């Protein structure tokens, strides 16, 4: 049996998996299309500290991360600022992606992983519904027992798969955020804002979010503007002008960033394994649907996949029967919650003008709910919390009833998504997929 594993993408998720798989005894090679210096973005992303303990990794060096400040959520009409107000010991880590990626690379290479940069992968090599390796852009064919696709939302490898594998090849544009994140200078003599990290929900009543945060050195303003599906230059400029009116810390000089990115913000794919193939991270849509953050879930999924390969239930660890266990575990522990949060995200994005302002302004949607949703957790309200919400939202009873129905549907979808058939059976798998995807059909 070919024990070679090819990982497509030297991002954080790919490097974490590669190190675990190599330590488990597999031969692992990573191919990355970009230059080493361009793989990770020059900014921070958030992650809970417990992630490292869960996957069995040490914390990165202290110079690689700091602590996130409390978020403040702002509804479209800006009538209220909802501050999360978490104690310091409950705040997320804010990890500097570029040095974090370099640290993960050193761990992977120390384990014996081979990493090739500026080596894009063109397509998967598939015969009789078994993935046998990849073809590089230079025409070289590289055989492998398993291809782990960390190629992101527009993965060329996933797009090249035959329809017979039943894996979604193209992600609908309306299941992605088009995002521009830019760091601007902070003009001199501007006051430190009361709310340092503001997230605008349905910003200026458009389908998306924006944020403005004060950098940790307090010298820059971190501005993200994202819209579902597409974002024109005019849309971006209008949103930026609105943020500038609210936040005097946003100067007119770009310090870094400014790239246009595409991020998946949907429930995980219904199928992300096949014989000799597994999707991992953004390529499987493992991000938190509310905000698009995916480092923590990707790292956890990488450890899950390595564990499954190390303790196969079949003679071939790369068989779909064995890899199915990886998907089932991910969906049980993480994916089910993400599916429920996706339903909440869609409901908020499609809500009528004024609804989000009412829910936040009256406290119907509490700080707790916002915290849970932004972290990708299942939202559960006790009878007492529901009663309290009813009192606060009585003036818009139809909206409140609509929200109550949504919460029940989310609970049902989380249960469905979390309970795949225990063992691989194609008919049962397909039946589960149909049930899982039903609430999201357009």
Where are these regions (language model features)?
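Glycine-rich FAD pyrophosphate-binding loop
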Residues: 6-10, 20-41
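C-terminal helical "tail/cap" subdomain of flavin- and related membrane-associated enzymes
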Residues: 310-442
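Short beta-strand to alpha-helix junction loop
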Residues: 86-106, 228-235
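N-terminal Rossmann-fold NAD(P) dinucleotide-binding loop
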Residues: 14-15
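FAD/FMN-dependent oxidoreductases across multiple families
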Residues: 141, 231-314, 318-327, 331-332
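Predominantly flavin-linked oxidoreductase catalytic cores and closely associated redox partners
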Residues: 107-249
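N-terminal FAD cofactor-binding segment of flavoenzymes
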Residues: 35-75
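Extreme N-terminal starter segment of soluble prokaryotic enzymes
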Residues: 1-5
């Amino acid at each position: 049996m070919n024990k070679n594993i090819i990982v497509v993408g030297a991002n954080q998720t790919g490097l974490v998996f590669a190190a675990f798989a190599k330590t488990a005894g597999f031969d692992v090679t990573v191919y990355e299309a970009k230059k080493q210096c361009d793989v990770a973005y020059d900014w921070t992303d958030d992650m809970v500290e417990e992630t490292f303990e869960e996957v069995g990794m040490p914390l990165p060096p202290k110079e690689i991360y700091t602590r996130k400040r409390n978020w403040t959520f702002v509804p479209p009409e800006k009538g209220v600022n909802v501050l999360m107000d978490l104690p310091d010991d409950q705040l997320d880590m804010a990890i500097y992606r570029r040095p974090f990626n370099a640290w993960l690379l050193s761990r992977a290479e120390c384990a014996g992983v081979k990493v090739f940069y500026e080596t894009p992968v063109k397509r998967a090599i598939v015969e009789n519904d078994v993935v046998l390796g990849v073809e590089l852009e230079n025409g070289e064919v590289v055989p492998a027992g398993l291809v782990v696709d960390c190629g992101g939302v527009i993965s060329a490898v996933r797009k090249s798969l035959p329809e017979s594998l039943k894996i979604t090849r193209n992600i609908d544009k309306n299941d992605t955020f088009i995002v521009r994140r830019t760091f601007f200078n902070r003009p001199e003599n501007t006051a430190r804002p009361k709310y340092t990290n503001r997230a605008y929900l349905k910003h200026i009543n458009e389908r998306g979010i924006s944020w403005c945060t004060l950098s940790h050195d307090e010298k820059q303003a971190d501005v993200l503007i994202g819209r579902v599906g597409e974002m024109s230059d005019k849309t971006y400029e209008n949103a930026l002008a609105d943020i500038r009116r609210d936040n005097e810390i946003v100067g007119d000089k770009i310090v870094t960033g400014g790239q246009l990115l595409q991020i998946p913000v949907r429930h995980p794919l219904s199928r992300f394994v096949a014989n000799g193939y597994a999707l991992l991270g953004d390529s499987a849509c493992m991000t938190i649907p509310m905000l698009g953050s995916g480092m923590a879930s990707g790292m956890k999924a990488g450890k899950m996949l390595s564990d499954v390969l190390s303790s196969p239930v079949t003679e071939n660890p790369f068989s779909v029967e064995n890899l199915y266990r990886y998907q089932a575990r991910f969906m049980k522990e993480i994916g089910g919650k993400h599916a429920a949060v996706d339903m909440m995200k869609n409901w908020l994005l499609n809500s009528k003008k004024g609804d989000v302002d009412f829910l936040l302004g009256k406290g119907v949607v509490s700080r707790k709910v916002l915290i849970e949703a932004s972290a990708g957790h299942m939202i559960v309200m006790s009878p007492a919390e529901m009663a309290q919400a009813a009192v606060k939202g009585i003036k818009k009873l139809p909206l409140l009833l609509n929200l109550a129905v949504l919460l029940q549907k989310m609970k049902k979808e989380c249960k469905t998504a979390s309970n795949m058939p225990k063992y691989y059976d194609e008919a049962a798998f397909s039946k589960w997929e149909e049930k899982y995807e039903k609430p999201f059909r357009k």
